């Protein structure tokens, strides 16, 4: 049996008179008269109008037509004819197929939701539960096509640039890199566990020691962490590593790749400028290490103005080593009611630990602010000058520890940009954020952690300070690629000196015994001639999400998890039989 001679986006005027066989899903069915029934037949490539003329068809065919429901799968044989009522909105809109035979290959039951058209009331949970139906919808199917095009573009570019596509293990050793590992018990080695890789980081560095020189991989990675709109417990990563390179070599290669992928996915020439900004500047100006440059609204430091103020809530913060910073919401005076401002205050307090959110409204009648009575006329004037605020603007101020101020105002800046529609959604702004600090002090755990990861090399200008025992303000040879406020890639030049690598582990609180237990195989490899090397990893899902202007990463992944890490379609994760646990020498301590 021939199921089809053409796909449903293929037929044109040149095919008139041909007898064709078509198969697909019934998109819509219209009884336009007692004698005529129209069906839009759909497959991955498009739609074709099928005409059933009752006067020309057998009773058997008519019976089949009457039974048809939307989304039933059918096979049709018919003749291509010119369409009298042409549809310029689809490629096949100049023709139609007059059916001679029809076969229902698979009838469709009552659908849980409408496939064709737009259903604004369709919940994401419903879409994820019936993901195989959701994929039939134009938006999801197009996103998967774009995903394919993106990955093929990556493979073509990397191959032409001399990179080798090398697989690395999925069952590996637990060496936590920040997030929790997903653990897999070993039945054949009782009491031991594999870990699913958070990234191929160690293996790709070992490949450089092995002489591969230029490596890439489209890798599955796994992180057991709290989820957001742009995160998943399992995700796809473009992993890249190169030997005998400096930072500029890697960044130039990545810029070429990004432009090539953009052109192939969007069809547009990607003559984008890749700006560069040190981490310290990004945090100071935008309160974020991944600033969205599509709009202004920068943070302004008021600490020097407030330092000796009689307003103790501000001045004491500065005197105790904190910061007082502000952002300006332009022309927001009439738009931001007290209710909106209260919501903003609750936002920065709840999610970022800020003690509060002060505000100053510049109205046509003067200054309106609960804190105006605590500030001198000179201080208020200096704040307005420093923030460059104008009549109609609203100044928001946070006084707190440095981290709190930056995270709170950085997030508030984004919210202001969205609420005031300051962001050009058709624009793409690339930014390299470079020179991240090596260490970040975790106040809760009372220890230093790696800001990027512990395999990042230290900038030559700061190496002597590090070797002399300094831990604060040690910068690294790092480079994160940010697109429209989303980090789509992160990389660095790596440490390739075993002594320095051991010193980094020591600063992170790992004893020699712990370092040997976790990374002994890795440190041993460095003894046998490790070349200078560096690389980068792209988050495929997040990069595609930004390119396609989607709000959620789940809209570019075929079968994603929810924010709770669940697959609503398969109902994973699920409980398992006690027998399975016994075979793995595991006993659950969880009590419902």
UniProtKB/Swiss-Prot annotation:
Residues 201-204 are annotated as: Aspartate. It is found in: Cytoplasm. The lineage of its organism: Bacteria, Fusobacteriati, Fusobacteriota, Fusobacteriia, Fusobacteriales. ATP binds at residues 223-225, 232, 487, 539-542. Keywords: Aminoacyl-tRNA synthetase, ATP-binding, Cytoplasm, Ligase, Nucleotide-binding, Protein biosynthesis. Its main location: cytoplasm. It catalyses: tRNA(Asp) + L-aspartate + ATP = L-aspartyl-tRNA(Asp) + AMP + diphosphate. GO terms for biological process: aspartyl-tRNA aminoacylation. This is Aspartate--tRNA ligase. Catalyzes the attachment of L-aspartate to tRNA(Asp) in a two-step reaction: L-aspartate is first activated by ATP to form Asp-AMP and then transferred to the acceptor end of tRNA(Asp). GO terms for molecular function: aspartate-tRNA ligase activity; ATP binding; nucleic acid binding. Disulfide bonds: none annotated. L-aspartate binds at residues 177, 223, 452, 494. Its EC number is 6.1.1.12. It comes from Fusobacterium nucleatum subsp. nucleatum (strain ATCC 25586 / DSM 15643 / BCRC 10681 / CIP 101130 / JCM 8532 / KCTC 2640 / LMG 13131 / VPI 4355). One of its GO terms (cellular component) is cytoplasm. It holds the Pfam family tRNA_anti-codon. InterPro entries: Aa-tRNA-synt_II (IPR004364), aa-tRNA-synth_II (IPR006195), aa-tRNA-synth_II/BPL/LPL (IPR045864), Asp-tRNA-ligase_1 (IPR004524), Asp-tRNA-ligase_1_N (IPR047089), Asp/Asn-tRNA-synth_IIb (IPR002312), AspRS_core (IPR047090), GAD-like_sf (IPR004115). The gene is aspS. Homodimer. Belongs to the class-II aminoacyl-tRNA synthetase family. Type 1 subfamily. It comes from the Bacteria.
């Amino acid at each position: 049996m021939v199921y089809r001679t053409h796909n449903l986006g293929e037929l044109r005027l040149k095919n008139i008179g041909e007898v064709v066989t078509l198969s697909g899903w019934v998109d819509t069915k219209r009884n336009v008269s007692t004698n005529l029934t129209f069906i839009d037949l759909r497959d991955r490539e498009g739609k074709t109008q099928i005409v059933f003329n009752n006067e020309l068809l057998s009773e058997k065919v008519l019976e089949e037509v009457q039974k048809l429901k939307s989304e039933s799968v059918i096979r049709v044989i018919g003749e291509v004819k010119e369409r009298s009522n042409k549809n310029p909105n689809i490629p096949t809109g100049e023709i139609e197929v007059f059916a001679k035979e029809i076969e229902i290959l698979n009838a469709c039951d009552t659908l849980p939701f409408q496939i064709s058209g737009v259903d604004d009331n369709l919940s994401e949970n419903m879409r994820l539960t019936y993901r195989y139906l959701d994929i039939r919808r134009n938006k999801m199917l197009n996103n998967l096509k774009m995903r394919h095009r993106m990955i093929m573009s990556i493979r073509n570019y990397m191959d032409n640039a001399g990179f080798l596509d090398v697989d690395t293990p999925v069952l590996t050793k637990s060496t936590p890199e920040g997030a929790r590992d997903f653990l897999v018990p070993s039945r054949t080695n009782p009491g031991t566990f594999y870990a699913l890789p958070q990234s191929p980081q160690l293996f790709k560095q070992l490949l450089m020691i092995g002489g591969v020189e230029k490596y890439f991989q489209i890798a599955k990675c796994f992180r057991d962490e709290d989820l957001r709109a742009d995160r998943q417990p399992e995700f796809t990563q473009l992993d890249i590593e190169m030997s005998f390179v400096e930072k500029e070599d890697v960044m130039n290669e990545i810029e070429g790749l990004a432009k090539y992928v953009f052109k192939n996915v969007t069809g547009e020439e990607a003559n984008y400028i890749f700006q560069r900004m040190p981490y310290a500047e990004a945090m100071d100006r935008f309160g974020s290490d991944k600033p969205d440059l599509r709009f202004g609204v920068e943070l302004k430091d008021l600490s020097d103005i407030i330092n000796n103020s009689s307003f103790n809530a501000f001045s004491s913060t500065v005197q105790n080593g904190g910061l007082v910073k502000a952002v300006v919401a332009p022309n927001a005076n009439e738009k931001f009611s007290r209710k909106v401002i209260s919501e903003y205050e609750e936002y920065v307090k709840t999610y970022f630990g800020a003690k509060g959110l002060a505000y100053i409204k510049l109205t046509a009648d003067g200054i309106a602010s609960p804190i105006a009575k605590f500030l001198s006329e000179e201080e208020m004037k200096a704040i307005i000058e420093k923030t460059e605020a104008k009549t109609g603007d609203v100044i928001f101020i946070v006084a707190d520890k440095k981290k709190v101020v930056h995270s709170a105002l950085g997030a508030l800046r984004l919210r202001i940009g969205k609420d005031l529609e300051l962001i050009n959604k058709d624009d793409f702004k690339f930014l390299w954020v470079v020179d991240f600090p090596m260490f970040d002090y975790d106040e809760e755990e009372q220890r230093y952690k790696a800001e990027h990861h512990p395999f990042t090399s230290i900038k030559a200008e700061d190496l002597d300070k590090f070797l002399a025992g300094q831990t604060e303000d040690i910068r690294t040879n790092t480079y994160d690629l940010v697109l429209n406020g989303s980090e789509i890639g992160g990389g660095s030049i790596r440490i390739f000196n075993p002594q320095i690598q051991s010193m980094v582990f020591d600063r992170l609180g790992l004893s020699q015994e712990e370092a040997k237990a976790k990374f002994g195989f890795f440190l041993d490899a460095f003894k046998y001639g490790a070349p200078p090397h560096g690389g980068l990893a792209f988050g495929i899902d997040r990069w595609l999400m930004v390119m396609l202007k989607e709000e959620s990463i789940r809209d570019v992944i075929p079968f994603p998890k929810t924010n709770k890490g669940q697959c609503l379609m398969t109902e994973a994760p699920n409980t398992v039989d006690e027998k399975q646990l016994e075979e793995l020498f595991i006993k659950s301590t969880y009590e419902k």
